[in-house]
Amino acid sequence: MLRRIAALSAIVLAAAAPLQAQAYVYPALQPSRIAEREYNFALADMGDGFGTGLIFQWREGLGNPKLQFTLDAGFADPDAPNADARLLIGGGLAYQLTSATTDMPFDIVLAGGLGLTTGDDVTTVRVPFGAAIGHRFPLEGDIAITPFVHPRLSWDRISFNGNSDSDTNLNVDIGANFEFKPQMAIRVAAALGDDDAVALSFAWTPKGLRK
């Protein structure tokens, strides 16, 4: 029992100093172009004792060619001994603000959402908003690479055993999307700033829905 209390205390202290929490801590993995439909499977090292997470992301166009809905779902295994796995869930909207042209070479996506993490009586709510900025470079054949940055500001709130606290945090994702097949890509990103984390993912776009 004492070991479990110590493990819970370690999680709370790590998450509340000062509220270094996302809908757990992982890169958004949002490239600089929205998708009509995309399924993204990610493995993340969440850093700062938060452990390893498995995340599924579903991105879906909303009929408007500039709008996209995103759903995140997954779980994390904290590093603290005897700590329970934590459920991760979130949703958001993305808007294609600009597309690259000869005059303005960057694709820009505005993205915001709401994320929830719960487990071991600790609940974290995160409301992020930012912009993914990048450029797609076609290479040989179907191969292309899109480096991107994604600065975002978030309001985070953590609750434990009737107590709660909140803070505003700034993070910047630096990443790249590597397309190696018409419907397949490998995506890697690191989140830097108030929270540090890295993630590697496989993204699949169903045939006929590739942008």
Predicted features and spans:
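Non-membrane alpha-helical segments in proteins
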Residues: 55-57, 72-76, 110-113
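Bacterial N-terminal signal peptides
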Residues: 8-16
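Bacterial Sec-dependent signal peptides at the C-terminal "C-region" and cleavage site
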Residues: 16-22
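Bacterial N-terminal signal peptides that target proteins for export
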Residues: 1-9
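Short coil/turn segments at secondary-structure boundaries
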Residues: 14, 80-81, 121
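Mid-chain, structured segments of secreted extracytoplasmic proteins
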Residues: 66-105
